[in-house]
Amino acid sequence: MESEKAMFVIVTYDVASKRVTKVMKTCRKYLKHVQKSVFEGMITEGKLNQLKNELISLIVCAEDKICIYKVDNLKYTSKEQIGIIEKDNNIL
């Protein structure tokens, strides 16, 4: 059995305050918390589907928004950070 290839994702969200903690804790199970409503990291398609299903069960689609950016190849990407820089924040 071939192992699943991981991809880099960035997840951002804008959800009602009463759901923020649950959404944050769910994202934290799969990805690194890099800003207030932003998570990033390497994840397989299977784990990403699990994350999406968990998030869908938590939000109200008419009120909340979650964006997932997928990067299959990091070759042409770079990251520039200004301000507070954490030690282990060098994924890109």
Where are these regions (language model features)?
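Basic nucleic-acid-binding interfaces
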Residues: 1-10, 16-92
